[in-house]
């Protein structure tokens, strides 16, 4: 039987939900009105908290304990956001803007535009 998010992450689940809300609220504040061409730079935004099965699989591959506390301590992607943009330039502009926000810290980024995954 699969664990629920609450069972796996325990009390940290509610903190993860709050982090997810902060990220989404911040993204909604992106100054899109500054775009003279009128094209909305963010087509849509999707967020998630990594599901327990995926997190356990990731931790097993790393050879560490598979509990929720270890997951939060040892990984950087318990909470994730995907922003789909109208144009490639918008991706870099939004990424740069996010890095200037002071209500969270970006721990790691991966540039799959410049360096696509091999699959």
Describe every region a protein language model picked out.
Residues 72, 85-119:
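Long beta-strand-rich cores associated with HINT superfamily self-processing modules
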Residues 79-85:
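Short cationic amphipathic helices and targeting signals
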Residues 63, 80, 117-119:
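Glycine-centered flexibility motif
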Residues 1-75:
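Charge-rich, low-complexity segments
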